[in-house]
């Protein structure tokens, strides 16, 4: 359900583009992102840093698109977000010696130490490549193709990447000790 909620601005952007064009779609995406963050704040009294970052980027690139009446800015938005993700994943290991993928996933997955480094690198490279691919589509195809790629192509590639990664990780997963598995479920309401 969270995945669909996170896609809310993208889906509305796509629908608005099909009905009214890129500038209305950009406005809709900006408003939808603000509403999404307001809802999260209202419900949880906390908003993730990534959601704030997304709001900042849609504000800057969406705003530039509307002010300068130039769709190139909104086409750069996914690339900037992807590249930021990739750089943060790589930079966190180098600068603060923290593997962010491990920090996010180690409660669900037990892997050998070397695999965590590889997983972080693979995710970083995936995001860097996705940013390049977005620019390739944005500059070599018309806006209609880019909008379709933004929703269907990007999501499709993400799903394929996650499935391939799952198969790859399954070969390297370690069994957790019985007491560690029970400790992980303490307080679980299932």
Swiss-Prot record:
<keyword id="KW-0812">Transmembrane</keyword>
<feature type="transmembrane region" description="Helical">
    <location>
        <begin position="76"/>
        <end position="96"/>
    </location>
</feature>
<dbReference type="Pfam" id="PF04279">
    <property type="entry name" value="IspA"/>
</dbReference>
<dbReference type="InterPro" id="IPR006008">
    <property type="entry name" value="YciB"/>
</dbReference>
<feature type="transmembrane region" description="Helical">
    <location>
        <begin position="24"/>
        <end position="44"/>
    </location>
</feature>
<feature type="transmembrane region" description="Helical">
    <location>
        <begin position="3"/>
        <end position="23"/>
    </location>
</feature>
<keyword id="KW-1003">Cell membrane</keyword>
<comment type="function">
    <text>Plays a role in cell envelope biogenesis, maintenance of cell envelope integrity and membrane homeostasis.</text>
</comment>
<comment type="similarity">
    <text>Belongs to the YciB family.</text>
</comment>
<feature type="transmembrane region" description="Helical">
    <location>
        <begin position="149"/>
        <end position="169"/>
    </location>
</feature>
<keyword id="KW-0997">Cell inner membrane</keyword>
<dbReference type="GO" id="GO:0005886">
    <property type="term" value="C:plasma membrane"/>
</dbReference>
<protein>
    <recommendedName>
        <fullName>Inner membrane-spanning protein YciB</fullName>
    </recommendedName>
</protein>
<feature type="transmembrane region" description="Helical">
    <location>
        <begin position="49"/>
        <end position="69"/>
    </location>
</feature>
<keyword id="KW-1133">Transmembrane helix</keyword>
<feature type="transmembrane region" description="Helical">
    <location>
        <begin position="121"/>
        <end position="141"/>
    </location>
</feature>
<keyword id="KW-0472">Membrane</keyword>
